């Protein structure tokens, strides 16, 4: 018997299932038709302004779960503030310049050799590529349910943005904070450009740690009285970058450390007393004796012979020397190390800077018999030569953390080249003081960024590429003197505001510069233009000025920056440095960071593991609200686990 007709059951037209993948696009379309975002802001007119400044993603690929997490958290805050007595506009932004975009654009266009096309043709390819991905990402972010000024975002390639960027550069340059110098920088031989610290990723790398003997040629009369035979007396250095040995010009010791003269067989070695046992063990030498000791400062200005190049390596002192590993006698190549460069440049200006490696990562003629080899080939060849000539003291295989290029993932070099720098030292104390006035969430963020700023070197802001904002510097045709003048840079800013930065590659210097511009050094009136572009971290580092300070419905400084924890060394820091240089204070009142999205087992998502999940997969199958629910229920300060089980569970329960 059918009892259905006898039961008084409730009836409703309300769907038993949410059907989010189909219903959400309809709801979103109605939001935009009804101008919900604009209506909310209009309703909040007259209320206190709250500005969350959006960190710009790169417009060169599809969005991933990390960006989905980030944009959703921002949307929660913007909505909450608009419902809590504030007027909270949201201006999304995009970072559009840089090497990754250039390489992907060239690949898409089938241009394998960038020199095969003109500057303007290359820049056109890159612009179209970036704007295409900007549209795709914008649609993806809108599909996630985010409200904001999607039709009027800030974009780093727009004329008004580039003009403001030149203004900030000009302010910094005229304050003496921008300079050109020959200094060791991270250099990617694959991409053939300098890199900033924020563009470096560390990975484990197998290598050889090598101990090398440098024969003493002048002991200042201190070692022979202890019984040393100078013809058989050596300083023993230690390094993990064998290829830099052709650049060695000095041996650095700690001035306050104790150094021993060690006899083993018929040879004599100078090394730190505290490291003698480990060094002799590495060489397999068990029968040895210490004949005497000296302070490091006593060794200063002793001389040694380079083991395979006809050159003297001077013994110098430096406070950067440690007794953590090696021999306490530091191989010093100022052309390939920041600390080496600093100690030589500041205290031993007579020591030459030798850079026997070219932009492709190959040894030059200055490397002697190793010329033409790659650095990897040179590692093996030099070690073999040292062994053959008796200059090898010991060699061990180790695995260490080594810097790699963020783009090509290959090992980078430290290499001295002429680059443009921002003087961080000049503003470091002011920046650290400003950090104290910012609210950091989590609280440990303050210590983290403070230590990073305290320890960082001057910021290399030049790149040897063509897709980016040109460095607005001119050079005298006669004497080569750089022209760093406010009027000249103002002319560039106004040109970019009117025509965009492509004009730099179209117009001659004389068409850009104010009439009557002369070289201050020689009076010449003819100039050439700088070929390098600015680091993309400088682009994003000035967004606080180009957006928050420029749009009259926002304010500066921003109330909040919210990004992943990797931005302590990236956007948070570049924004802070440009802001301190420009206005002497931080560009944000509060900074919040979130963790990474990892798989259900806590592993990083990657193609090799096959554990990656695209936001679009979740949205298409379950709906954006389910993804938003996952974000809302997660502790975003730590790494967040995600699997399809995490996503499907709320759907099943509903």
Indicate residue ranges for each PLM-predicted region:
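Residue patterns forming the tRNA-binding/recognition surfaces of aminoacyl-tRNA synthetases
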Residues: 2-13, 17-20, 26, 30-34, ...
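Histidine-rich, glycine-flanked metal-binding segment
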Residues: 17-47, 280-285
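N-terminal catalytic cores of NTP/NDP-binding nucleotidyl/phosphoryl-transfer enzymes
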Residues: 42-104, 237-246, 315-343, 347, ...
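Aromatic- and glycine-enriched glycan-recognition loops and surfaces
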Residues: 69-72, 373-377, 513
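Structured, non-catalytic alpha/beta "coupling" segments that mediate domain-domain communication
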Residues: 89, 246-292, 393-424, 648, ...
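Alpha-helical recognition segments enriched in aromatics with Gly/Pro capping
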Residues: 218, 347-360, 465-467, 486-639
